[in-house]
A protein has these predicted regions:
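N-terminal signal peptide c-region/cleavage motif recognized by signal peptidases
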Residues: 13-15
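Periplasmic-binding protein-like
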Residues: 102, 191-200, 206, 244-265
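A bilobed periplasmic-binding-protein/Venus flytrap-type ligand-binding module shared by bacterial periplasmic
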Residues: 130-135, 177-180, 260-272, 291
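A ligand-binding cleft/hinge motif common to bilobed small-molecule-binding domains
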Residues: 79-82, 224-245
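Conserved C-terminal helix/tail region of periplasmic/extracytoplasmic solute-binding proteins
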Residues: 215, 323-353
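Extracytoplasmic ligand-binding site segments that recognize negatively charged/polar headgroups
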Residues: 76, 80, 84-204, 209-218
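Early extracytoplasmic/lumenal segment of secretory-pathway proteins
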Residues: 19-83
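Mature extracytoplasmic/periplasmic domains
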Residues: 267-328
């Protein structure tokens, strides 16, 4: 009788156990290949439920408001230090992530997370310029500098056909680079200079866009964008699929640009930290890591992925820059509270005018 009761209780608990076998991932949209998710679900006998944020500022705001229920988060690395200090993350148990050995040394042990205590590299993007090659040729322009985004003399020819990222950190970084400063310059006077550069260029821009510029660039409605390398790659694919007469090209500004290394971290109150570790290790497998690059054209810090990446993508210098170009790339560093308040104030002034 006791055995029967135990069996009945066990059977009754199975639906609850199955219901709990859910990994909650908070990520950017379209930042993991669907087939990769399917493979993981099959391997772990679980479900992956994804929620999406448009940028790191939205992610931070949600966590600051007390959001819970997430297992894996995918922020940009320079935000990891602040997230850890805020108590939002738990350390990664590296004994459960043996595939960490696949990550190139250049992307490990960053100043944002020494020893990779809280984060594991996922993918990277480079913020650059994308453009409609047909329209740019017709206008007689050469796109090799941030002047294409900020110089009114050039923008006059592109009026209302340019979009810029709706990101205070990215747009200010581009303006600082244009002025000859580091993207991590902290001099308030230089920030004011960058603000003035942006305000002078703003009347010529069509919009600030965090998303949607891929489709507009592919459709030919927008001719030039300040955007991410993987988005520009996808816009070119879209233009080709639509059989457009133009191609969407990448342009690496000669002044340099931002390289954003995105990372996987585990939320402090993750309901399924065990699944989170399984997922992180799974994503560091060469084939699984390559799936993302092959789908969206993201940069890849995984040595084991290289043999699985499409040759035409691997050959693109905008996605896998050469050594000389790489020297001009910088990772953004997080701001302290005083700097963030000033940056927020400058951004409010930019958006209001």
């Amino acid at each position: 009788m006791k055995r029967l009761v135990f069996t009945l209780l066990l059977l009754a608990s199975l639906p609850a156990l199955a219901q709990n076998a859910v990994l909650h991932v908070y990520n950017c949209n379209d930042y993991i290949a669907p087939e990769t998710v399917e493979r993981f679900e099959k391997q772990c006998a679980c479900k992956v439920k994804q929620s999406y944020f448009s940028d790191n500022e939205e992610l931070l705001a949600k966590l600051a408001a007390g959001a819970k229920g997430y297992d894996v988060l995918v922020p940009t690395s320079n935000y990891v230090q602040g997230m850890a200090k805020a108590g939002w993350l738990q350390p990664v148990d590296k004994s459960k992530v043996p595939n960490l050995k696949n990550i190139m040394p250049a992307y490990l042990d960053t100043p944002f997370d020494p020893g990779n205590k809280f984060s594991v590299p996922y993918a990277y993007t480079i913020t650059m310029i994308g453009y409609n090659d047909q329209k740019i040729k017709e206008l007689g322009l050469t796109i090799d500098s941030w002047s294409a985004i900020f110089d009114p003399r050039i923008l006059e020819k592109l009026k209302n056909r340019v979009t810029v990222l709706d990101s205070q950190s990215e747009l200010m970084a581009a303006a600082l680079k244009y002025l000859g400063y580091s993207v991590n310059d902290r001099d308030p006077k230089h920030w004011q200079e960058a603000k003035q550069v942006i305000l002078k260029a703003k009347p010529y821009w069509a919009a600030f866009k965090a998303s949607g510029y891929i489709e507009q660039l592919a459709a030919g409605n927008i001719w030039l964008v300040h955007g991410y390398s993987n988005d520009i790659y996808q816009a070119d694919l879209g233009a080709q699929e639509a059989k457009q007469k133009f191609r969407v090209r990448h342009a690496m500004p000669k002044e340099g640009a931002v390289l954003a290394l995105d990372a996987m971290v585990i939320h402090k109150s993750a309901p399924r930290a065990d699944l989170a570790h399984q997922f992180i290790n799974f994503m560091l497998d060469g084939q699984n890591s390559a799936d993302l690059t092959n789908m969206i054209g993201s940069g890849n810090p995984n040595t084991a992925a290289m043999q699985h990446i499409k040759p035409e993508i691997k050959a693109m210098s905008a996605i896998f820059p050469d050594e000389q170009t790489a020297k001009k790339l910088e990772m953004l560093k997080d701001l302290n509270s005083k700097e963030r308040r000033l940056m927020n104030r400058i951004w409010t002034e930019i958006k209001a005018k």
